[in-house]
């Protein structure tokens, strides 16, 4: 039973060693860039000959033919000059349509039978408290520049103290793991 416990604790220590092996401060920030791919040539080229088995005679090289030049294209014929477009005829601008006079609509006549409606007493909605309408008060003592601003989170720590502490922790965990393995067996 004790061997199982010691083995479990040892495995846990080994896991801590491997997980803590690289601290986030030393981890790479950018992923490695891939090498650029060579673009495939788009011009028609003579494909290389298939590899031939080794022979004692040197293969004869065929002369490479130069590409045939295309015949010069004929000069385009001069285009006829186009006359400017004819001015558009001036059209009479239509006048605005006349507005029809509105007819007076008589009010509906009152009837003897009146519908009974329920009257509700409407209470005004409560408004927000006056304290909520004003902006918050500034703190009594605003923090001024002090020693806490000396180390900003953007500045990298170049002292190496963190690396040393991580290495010490890894060595300690490895020593504990090995001692537990020795005690277990």
From Swiss-Prot:
Native organism: Arabidopsis thaliana
Q: Which family does it belong to?
A: Belongs to the lysine-rich AGP family.
Compositional bias ranges of the Low complexity kind:
43-68
What's the encoding gene here? AGP17
Cite the record's Basic residues compositional bias ranges. Answer: 111-122
Tissue-level expression reads: Predominantly expressed in open flowers. Also expressed in leaves and stems, and at a lower level in roots.
Post-translational modifications: O-glycosylated on the hydroxyproline residues.
**Compartmental location:** Cell membrane
Q: Which residues form the signal peptide?
A: 1-21
The UniProt record lists lipidation (GPI-anchor amidated serine) at 159
Quote the protein name from its UniProt record.
Lysine-rich arabinogalactan protein 17
Q: Does the keyword ATP-binding apply?
A: no
Cellular component annotations (GO), alphabetically ordered: plasma membrane; side of membrane
PANTHER family recorded for this chain? LYSINE-RICH ARABINOGALACTAN PROTEIN 17 (PTHR37209:SF3), LYSINE-RICH ARABINOGALACTAN PROTEIN 17-RELATED (PTHR37209)
């Amino acid at each position: 039973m004790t061997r199982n416990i010691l083995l479990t604790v040892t495995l846990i220590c080994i896991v801590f060693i491997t997980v803590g092996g690289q601290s986030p401060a030393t981890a790479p920030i950018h992923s490695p860039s891939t090498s650029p791919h060579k673009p495939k040539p788009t011009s028609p080229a003579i494909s290389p000959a298939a590899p031939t088995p080794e022979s004692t005679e040197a293969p004869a090289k065929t002369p490479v033919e130069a590409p045939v030049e295309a015949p010069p294209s004929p000069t385009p014929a001069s285009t006829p000059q186009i006359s400017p477009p004819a001015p558009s005829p001036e059209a009479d601008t239509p006048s605005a349509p006349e507005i029809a006079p509105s007819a007076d609509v008589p009010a509906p006549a009152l009837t003897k039978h009146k519908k009974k409606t329920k009257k509700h007493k409407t209470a005004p909605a409560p408004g927000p408290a006056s304290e909520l309408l004003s902006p918050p008060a500034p703190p009594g003592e605003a923090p001024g520049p002090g020693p806490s601003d000396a180390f900003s989170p953007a500045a990298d720590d170049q002292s190496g103290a963190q690396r040393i502490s991580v290495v010490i922790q890894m060595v300690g965990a490895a020593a504990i793991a090995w001692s537990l393995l020795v005690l277990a067996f």
